[in-house]
Amino acid sequence: MYSYGDSQVIFDLNMNCRKVGITAILGRNGAGKSTLLKTISGEVSYSEGQIIYDGIETKFESQDIRCLRGIGYVPQENAVFGSLTVHENLLLGGISLKEKCDIDVVLDYFPKLSQRLNQQAGTLSGGERKMLAISRSLLGKPKLLLLDEPTEGVWVGVIEEISQILQKLSKELAIILVEQHVKLALDVSNYAYVMDRGRVAMHGDSIKMKDDPKLLKLLAP
């Protein structure tokens, strides 16, 4: 599906995502999880296969077009402007989109940010920066939200907070979640895929997958 130079990174991938709810993508480092999200978002191109979103093939659509059509993407890397305030970062969310969600509506999901609107984003904790990145993406009113490791480097208390936020969001839109915390991912998701070396090695209902011994083997270092 996706190749970098002469090297193929993702192979024979067949996935479906519900219109509402969370689909988790699990796997060891280097399995192709982040590459998959980058490909869906349009950050990287793919040479073979198809990605169908809302009934339309996305191969020849730029990342901006996909964003306009409702695909939001929060990468693993720091996605906020540290020199700007929280409020200024939010104003940038969906700035080029015709239809934007009201900032106050988004902040209902993230009450901590409401108390830090005039604070520089660079002074926020890791968890708060993750929340800001997600909230800024939500201002574009996505139908599909791609989240790459939203709890990476986040204090355990904030992880639970992010988990609750994701569960609330999942009632209104589709989320594809790449997550290193397997228990969290399976707790919040409806369906899960496990990738291994660029392929889907296992998939099924998240509840049933928790007790499957095959999962531990696939995720073992």
Please annotate each region the language model reported.
Residues 26-28:
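The feature captures the beta-strand-to-loop junction immediately N-terminal to the Walker
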Residues 41:
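Helix-to-loop junction immediately C-terminal to a conserved catalytic motif
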Residues 49-60, 69, 99-103, 108, ...:
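Conserved ABC transporter NBD signature motif
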Residues 57-78, 115-118, 209-213:
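ABC ATPase NBD coupling module
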Residues 120-124, 128:
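Conserved ABC ATPase signature
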Residues 137-138:
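ABC ATPase C-loop
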Residues 145-149:
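Catalytic Walker B motif of ABC-type/P-loop ATPase nucleotide-binding domains
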